[in-house]
Amino acid sequence: MIPGEIDALPGDIDINAGLPTVTVEVTNTGDRPVQVGSHYHFFETNPALSFTRAQTRGFRLNIAAGTAVRFEPGQTRTVELVALGGERKVYGFRGDVMGDL
């Protein structure tokens, strides 16, 4: 093996298979772009993003790790979210939860 080489199995990788998901329509009501990373607790995103927040508690974007979704001012887009795993505790972000989900 060469340093840095990736030896992956053939075929597609199905990320987050079998985990609960929710689809949400999101509108950026602000005057600046908002970018949300793959592992950010969607419930706690920028208040300029308008959507039904209650249904997103405990969810993050269902996209590959290290990537993000950008919402331009005035833009509406539909995103799929996936349930957070692990102990289902959330700390930090905007400080809206700070504990068990």
Curated annotation (Swiss-Prot):
UniProt keyword list: Cytoplasm, Hydrolase
Subcellular location: Cytoplasm
Primary subcellular site in the record, as a coarse category: cytoplasm
Pfam families per UniProt: Urease_beta (PF00699)
One GO CC annotation: urease complex
Catalytic reactions of this protein: urea + 2 H2O + H(+) = hydrogencarbonate + 2 NH4(+)
Disulphide bridges, residue numbers: none
Pathways involved: Nitrogen metabolism; urea degradation; CO(2) and NH(3) from urea (urease route): step 1/1
Keyword Nucleus in annotation: no
E.C. number: 3.5.1.5
An MF annotation (GO) of this entry: urease activity
Entry's Gene Ontology BP terms: urea catabolic process
InterPro entries in UniProt: Urease_beta-like (IPR002019), Urease_betasu_sf (IPR036461), Urease_subunit (IPR050069)
Domain of life assignment: Bacteria
Subunit structure of this chain's protein: Heterotrimer of UreA (gamma), UreB (beta) and UreC (alpha) subunits. Three heterotrimers associate to form the active enzyme.
Similarity annotation: Belongs to the urease beta subunit family.
PANTHER family per UniProt: UREASE
The name this protein goes by in its record: Urease subunit beta
Species the sequence originates in: Hahella chejuensis (strain KCTC 2396)
Record gene name: ureB
